[in-house]
Amino acid sequence: MFRIRFGFCVYDCLRDRRLFVVFFMNTKGKDLTKEPPRSPKTRVGGYAILGRTIDKCRALLWGNIGEYHFDCPLDNMLFGFKGLKGDDFRAQIEKGASDQQMVEWLDQSGEKKSPDEIKRWSNEVEATKPYEDPERRDWFAEQVKPLGLDPQTTPLFDWLETDDRVSYKKAA
């Protein structure tokens, strides 16, 4: 009771919803100013992207998201697959949901998907090559060439992993 009353007192004094949420969150997550989020290939509950999206959302709430973005086109691949909105996802993270609780919420929310559909979708997004999309081809080529990657053969997730590795290696 005291903790809740104190929390509301802090909220009333600071008028900053983010600080209030952070005060009560159970799971702090990664500091993305010091380390990258999980690879988009890391599957949580069978979903590609999910671990990375969770890391970015938690970091956003804690104020240490660095140069990453939550509810970006990558995250929206997951949200679109399930028919969800980033704000709904964020609301669950704000409640302090663990990775497992997020999997359970994702399975129960939005469009119902079978384990086979989830696996097939995860495999498809992992193999996505932006170079094959004429609208993204030039942009993607600009992004991967400084990293020594071939835009024609590099999947999106490989580029993200390489960019994370190189970016944090420079910072170290």
Positions of predicted regions on the chain:
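Alpha-helix boundary/N-cap detector
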Residues: K41-A48, H69, P73, M77, ...
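Polar/charged low-complexity regulatory segments
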Residues: N26-I65, V125-A171
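Amphipathic alpha-helical packing elements
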Residues: N64-L106
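Amphipathic protein-protein interaction modules
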Residues: F89, I93-L147
